[in-house]
Amino acid sequence: MADFGADEASSKSESPEQEDQGSEDRSLLHQRLAIRELIDTEVSYLHTLRLCASDIRSHLQQLPPGDLDILFSNIDDIIQVSSRFLRGLQETACREEEQAHLIGNLFLEFQEEFEQVYKVYCANYDQALLLVKAYQKEPELQKEIQGIIEAAMPQAGPSGLSFFLVIPLQRITKYPLLLQKILENTPADASAHPALQRATSALQDVNGNINEYKMRKEVALKYTKVEQLSLRERLARINTHTLSKKTTRLSQMLKQEAGLVSRTEDKEFDDLEERFQWVSLCVKELRNNVVDFMGNLEVFLSFRPHERSLDIPGGPAEQYCSLARDLQLHAFLQFKQRLRSLVWQPLCSLARALAGPQNLIKKRLDKLLDFDRVEEKLLDVGSVTWEEEAARHEYQALNSLLVAELPQFNQLVMQWLGQILCTFVVLQRDLADQVLRRAESTMALLPHHHVSEPDFQKLLEHTLGQSSSQLRLFQESFEKVLPPSTTQPLLPGSEHQMQALLTRYGPEKLYQVSSNINGTGTLDLTLLRGQIVALLQNKDTKGNNSRWLVDTGGHRGYVPAGKLQLYHPIIPSEKELRGQTGTHEDSWLPAPEPTQLSVPTVPTMSQVVAVYPFVARSTHELSLQAGQPVTILEAQDKKGNPEWSLVEANGQRGYVPSNFLARTPSPTPWGWNLPS
């Protein structure tokens, strides 16, 4: 009896220790079961993802273009991350004592990757569900999709595509629960406890960040939708709420501009927006340049001299026509097609991609006004309404989205822009190589193919110089035998300039430009047809008589001598002065240089015509057409203003601007003589 009592007392004293040991064993068992559940479910999850990406997606190619990208989003990225994560989980099995600690560190290692891949998928999930609902409204398509799913995974049931699409969302939200289960069965003094605790908190933060990102994307999607609305539809959307909101924002903006209230400043966003606007300007400039280049290319291809009959049988001319025809039909056509598909179309897509962020930036400015107003009210009153709090959070979400996404967007646009420029350069180089290859066989037949490039350049310059001299001689010969060219009317507003040149240099030095002159050198002038200049020297510094030094009254420079005609003022006779009350301006008519050849000339008489069309704005004015002859009754209005002239045309009288009129010569019928 004494021994039995001693054993009983001993068993009672050992029972608390045994209970503690049993509790630890149960916790360890539950921990290992939780770890086993984590690994087994990860294996099943990855298998389902691969099945969805391979068997199901590959058999849904009959869906409209682009739908597969929306349905399955970045599932390939999720598979890649999950594969590496599962491999890491399986490697922890060989170190059973440290397995819980290794799993906690593994989750911390994959924290950022989980957030990056799952936030994209979760943000696109709602759009994928909209597509699934749209497919359900088409019985034949839905039946075909259901057959594909049942063949791949019979346990999916009637839920169809939505069964697979929701799996990644369920998995990322289950990670914190699985970690929490492992953590609960890990002693607080165990070495794995801190790592598991950090991992659980990190995965909870990941889910919170994903939800916040999804909310931002929903706000962005709301304001990036481009709606093509007519004016009637836009007016129909205006209501009292819209007017009140616009008025409040305008009032807030005016108070900020006046300095009555403060404005929220965000230096980080301002820098990003400036960068975005600069990138947008680069895209716009490049697009305009490509448009001009393609237009010039079309003009270049429209000229086809090889299709003309040159009347030069055989020789280099025939070889050139053959080469030009080959380039026109093959090399240039291929270059044009590649330019459109590889440069123009991507550039247009890039320009369209800028519209969404641009709309978000504009909408952010509106939301910033609402935010500042709510913040001001919150400081004054201490509380805001539910709608005002929602507007406040909407601005914060929109601003956070832009600050987070604009740097990456700007970088991608610059990379895209650089690729387009590189492609354009490569296309130019390929075209040059094609032209050289096609010209090699023809070049061997040309008379100067054996000449070196420097010698060929000298030969080319010499030939062009000779041709230019011959053309100049031909031009001078034709100018001597041709009748005098038609006198050009004076440019509007050039009368005072002509008077100054006449006073300074005299009538014998006055010349009028017979055709437009485009200066190409640093000392060359660009002049318009009809402009009056004064001759300073009839040759240039090298003694070339074909270039004259002239004065326009403001600038001095060289112009081609062949484009100048000598002019003298024509003084109207007393009869003409009596026949007209006055003229608005003195007119200067050309007198051709006397030539040695006897050429019949046509006598001319002075005539006042409208140089430009004029539309009357009142009953006191007279409408005129360009070139319409008029009779000047008074060279000023009733107040003596010479800028208006009273004229008569077609039996009607009225005032017209004086600088719209010019005196031009008109041929006199043969046999008539001007009165002496």
Curated annotation (Swiss-Prot):
It comes from Mus musculus. Keywords: Guanine-nucleotide releasing factor, Repeat, SH3 domain. This is Rho guanine nucleotide exchange factor 37. Residues 1-26 are annotated as: Disordered. One of its GO terms (cellular component) is cytoplasm. One of its GO terms (molecular function) is guanyl-nucleotide exchange factor activity. Gene3D superfamilies: Arfaptin homology (AH) domain/BAR domain, Dbl homology (DH) domain, SH3 Domains. Residues 506-569, 603-666 form the SH3 domain. May act as a guanine nucleotide exchange factor (GEF). InterPro entries: AH/BAR_dom_sf, ARHGEF37_SH3_2, ARHGEF37_SH3_C1, BAR_dom, DBL_dom_sf, DH_dom, Dynamin-Rho_GEF, SH3-like_dom_sf. Pfam families: BAR, RhoGEF, SH3_2, SH3_9. Residues 254-455 form the BAR domain. It comes from the Eukaryota. Residues 30-213 form the DH domain. The lineage of its organism: Eukaryota, Metazoa, Chordata, Craniata, Vertebrata.
